[in-house]
């Protein structure tokens, strides 16, 4: 998720044989993943072929990345070479998610004070995720196991982590007392991550700025540590000169960061893409990705504002997670569209959950909105998991590799 990905370059070496079995130690997990998979493979043969031709390109370096590189280089040397890069990534993501879910349990409305250890665990969890996310690409090169699946898996985990990171930050500063600000901060974070890959879809190059995700993550770690040390009193204190509560400081930083980042993203997008006549890398309109993230944000805003029972105000964490899973799904599809040089289609099963909420409100909420929100949350989560498992398994099968294990003999060719 961070600027260190510029050094990862996990788009490596391909082969197209198909595996004959899952392997006995992993047979149960393999059967489970087959059960979860979509009935129809998400990628066509032509998309898989273009995936083989994909090359990772990035430019730019964030402010703290050179400082952190020494630590990351040391850390990857401590990892056994039999551990797969994707396994490192998923472990970091699970730690990040679990620590945030614990915080959500104690603060379901983002207004409560959680035990001190929960804030500390979130800070540690995010640091672990940042560190493991930084070394997975290094481990891939170190073990000679770089593939396009690694890049996709990395970005996919980042898209989900973004949801939990922004939610955890809002809980840490008790932003639930200001629901409009909490709504803005969470969806601004998702939107900026989407835009980073939108401009990549247009230009073919992932760009990193001076202030990028590494810096933002460290800022959020500090927020969690302050929450552990200062508690509610800290966030109620007023900021001199600005005369606003301390809890709005992260929100104001989000506004500034959104304006700065989106200005850079849209400058690239509106300059024109690398495709024919200034189109995207897939030859589509540079504005076409707006429909997907725009639909997520518009639906979320309408349901929030039209709710007769203050659905978002009373259940902000459930609400953010529901739409966060939808946002993660469409972001993943954007990354896939870039890597396979293909068009994004607007119709998507990810929108079933939000559609249920919208239709329920349209018919005067004849079903309890809280119940429908839970249904939408479950549907959105299952849809994201099924898509993610399906596409990872399909690509792994096509490249004759395994998602979480390093195969000893892999046919390779130069990707540089």
Curated annotation (Swiss-Prot):
GO MF terms held by the record: 1-alkenyl-2-acylglycerol choline phosphotransferase activity; diacylglycerol cholinephosphotransferase activity; ethanolaminephosphotransferase activity; metal ion binding
Sites where the protein binds Mg(2+) 1: 133, 154
Keywords associated with the record: Endoplasmic reticulum, Glycoprotein, Lipid biosynthesis, Lipid metabolism, Magnesium, Manganese, Membrane, Metal-binding, Nucleus, Phospholipid biosynthesis, Phospholipid metabolism, Transferase, Transmembrane, Transmembrane helix
Pfam families cross-referenced by the UniProt entry: CDP-OH_P_transf
Compartments, record wording: Endoplasmic reticulum membrane; Nucleus membrane
Sugar attachment sites: 144
Residues where CDP-choline binds: 86, 151
Listed pathway(s): Phospholipid metabolism; phosphatidylethanolamine biosynthesis; phosphatidylethanolamine from ethanolamine: step 3/3; Phospholipid metabolism; phosphatidylcholine biosynthesis; phosphatidylcholine from phosphocholine: step 2/2
PROSITE patterns: CDP_ALCOHOL_P_TRANSF
Gene Ontology biological process terms in this record: phosphatidylethanolamine biosynthetic process
Active site: 155
Annotated transmembrane regions: 89-108, 116-133, 156-176, 180-199, 210-230, 246-267, 286-306, 315-334, 349-363, 368-388
Database matches in InterPro entries: CDP-OH_P_trans (IPR000462), CDP-OH_PTrfase_TM_dom (IPR043130), CDP_ALCOHOL_P_TRANSF_CS (IPR048254), CHOPT (IPR014472)
UniProt enzyme class: transferase
Topology versus the membrane: Multi-pass membrane protein
Cofactor: Mg(2+); Mn(2+)
Function: Catalyzes both phosphatidylcholine and phosphatidylethanolamine biosynthesis from CDP-choline and CDP-ethanolamine, respectively. Involved in protein-dependent process of phospholipid transport to distribute phosphatidyl choline to the lumenal surface. Has a higher cholinephosphotransferase activity than ethanolaminephosphotransferase activity.
Family: Belongs to the CDP-alcohol phosphatidyltransferase class-I family.
PANTHER family: CHOLINE_ETHANOLAMINEPHOSPHOTRANSFERASE 1 (PTHR10414:SF27), ETHANOLAMINEPHOSPHOTRANSFERASE (PTHR10414)
Protein name: Choline/ethanolaminephosphotransferase 1
Organism: Xenopus tropicalis (Western clawed frog)
Lineage: Eukaryota, Metazoa, Chordata, Craniata, Vertebrata
């Amino acid at each position: 998720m961070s600027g260190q990905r510029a050094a990862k370059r996990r788009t490596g070496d391909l082969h197209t044989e198909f595996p004959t079995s899952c392997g006995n130690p992993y047979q149960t997990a393999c059967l489970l993943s087959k059960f979860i998979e979509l009935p129809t493979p998400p990628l066509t043969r032509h998309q898989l072929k273009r995936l083989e031709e994909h090359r990772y390109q990035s430019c730019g370096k964030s402010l703290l990345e050179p400082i952190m590189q020494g630590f990351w280089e040391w850390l990857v040397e401590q990892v056994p070479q039999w551990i797969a890069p994707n396994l490192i990534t998923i472990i970091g993501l699970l730690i990040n998610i679990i620590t945030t879910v614990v915080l959500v349990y104690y603060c379901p409305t983002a207004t409560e004070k959680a035990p001190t250890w929960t804030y500390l665990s979130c800070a540690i969890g995010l640091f672990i995720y940042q560190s493991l996310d930084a070394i997975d690409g290094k481990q891939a090169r170190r073990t000679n196991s770089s593939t396009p699946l690694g890049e996709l898996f990395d970005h996919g985990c980042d898209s989900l982590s973004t949801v939990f990171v922004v939610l955890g930050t809002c809980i840490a500063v008790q932003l639930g007392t200001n629901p409009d600000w909490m709504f803005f901060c969470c969806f601004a974070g998702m939107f900026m991550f989407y835009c980073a890959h939108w401009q990549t879809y247009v230009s073919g190059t992932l760009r990193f700025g001076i202030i990028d995700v590494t810096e933002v993550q460290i800022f959020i770690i500090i927020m969690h540590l302050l929450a552990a040390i200062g508690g509610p009193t800290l966030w109620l204190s007023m900021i001199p000169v600005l005369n606003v509560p301390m809890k709005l400081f992260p929100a104001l930083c989000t506004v500034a960061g959104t304006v700065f980042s989106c200005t850079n993203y849209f400058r690239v997008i509106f300059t024109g893409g690398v495709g024919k006549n200034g189109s995207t890398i897939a030859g589509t309109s540079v504005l076409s990705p707006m429909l997907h993230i725009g639909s997520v944000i518009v639906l979320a805003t309408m349901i929030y504002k039209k709710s007769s029972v203050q659905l978002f105000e009373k259940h902000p964490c459930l609400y953010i997670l529901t739409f966060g899973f939808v946002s993660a799904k469409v972001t993943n599809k954007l990354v896939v569209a870039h890597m396979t040089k293909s068009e994004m289609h607007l119709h998507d099963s990810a929108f079933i959950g939000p559609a249920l909420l919208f239709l329920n409100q349209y018919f005067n909420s004849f079903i309890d909105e809280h119940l429908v929100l839970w249904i939408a949350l479950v549907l959105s989560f299952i849809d994201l998991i099924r898509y993610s498992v399906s596409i990872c398994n399909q690509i792994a099968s096509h490249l004759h590799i395994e998602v979480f294990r390093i195969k000893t003999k892999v046919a390779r060719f130069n990707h540089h």
